[in-house]
Amino acid sequence: MLVIDSFRGRYRFLSNFSPAIVVYNKNAYPTVEHAYQAAKTLDEDWQEAIFWAKSPTEAKRLGRKVPLREDWEQIKLKVMEDLLRQKFSTFEMKSKLLATGNEHLVEGNTWGDNFWGAVKVKKLRFTYQTYYTWEGKNHLGKLLMKIREEIREDL
């Protein structure tokens, strides 16, 4: 199985930090990350602060501080899916996503996010050979592959 395990370089467009105008709650955000972090709260002051964040990194930092909406755990996957559908709704972005072929998409990371992505873990076989595996739920990768398949089916 072929794997894209880094959303950097030529695959940066897969990252939630890459520029892509998406709308949430009538506001047009510069990245999926901005919109996702704003969606975590119902507090309009926090949403506005995230809207004006100068970078997706700053938006993510602010999102860690917001008072979470009560239903967040139940809706966060749906929110992300909706934002990703917007991001990959243009011809250019659909084409880029389709160009990943059938490769397995893994949001590989070193910061320990095993919900949206996966973390590379060193393992040892009984023969004392070292190998690496990805551990995590990889929800971002799964959503991207789902959307890619739906785009392919619509062709």
Per-region residue spans from a language model:
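Charged, low-complexity intrinsically disordered segments
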Residues: M1-L155
